[in-house]
Amino acid sequence: QPVQATEREQAIIAAVRNAAPGHGLDPARAAAFFHDQIEANKLVQYARLSQWQLAGAAPALPRHDLQRIIRPRLDDLQTDLLHQLASFDQTRSRQCARKLALALAQRQGDALHRAGMIRATGQLCD
């Protein structure tokens, strides 16, 4: 499957905009947050594809079906993320950007996933 799935991304953003008011969120805020999640995911996917090209093969691991398993899980996660974003916004500190930077700096993991987290939270404190 290609990494870039413009129609799917547009459908997700439209669904998030529609669901946002039910969570007490501005549709533009929710759309920006989910846009960042999508872009972070693509950043990691493109990097992994590049690594696999260099290695000559993807890891020999079982792959989950995108249509039947992965996307339904992601759809369920949308509601949870909207709820968490609304909760975050209600308690957001004025020092959000600094606290976020500190939290990201303390995260474990490889450089690629740290970069993905930075991208995913790019507008979180706006």
List PLM regions with ranges:
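Short secondary-structure junctions and interdomain/linker hinges
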Residues: 23, 41-44, 81, 88, ...
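Mid-length scaffold segments of soluble, non-membrane domains
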Residues: 22-60
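Generic structural signal for well-ordered, non-transmembrane alpha-helical segments
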Residues: 10, 14, 35-38, 42, ...
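Extended amphipathic alpha-helical interaction segments
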Residues: 49-90
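Short, charged low-complexity intrinsically disordered segments located at boundaries
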Residues: 15-24, 46-50, 65-69, 105-116
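Alpha-helical context
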Residues: 6-13, 17, 53, 57, ...
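N-terminal Sec/ER secretory leader and immediately downstream segment
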Residues: 1-36
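Glycine-rich, aromatic-bearing surface loops/beta-hairpins
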Residues: 85-126
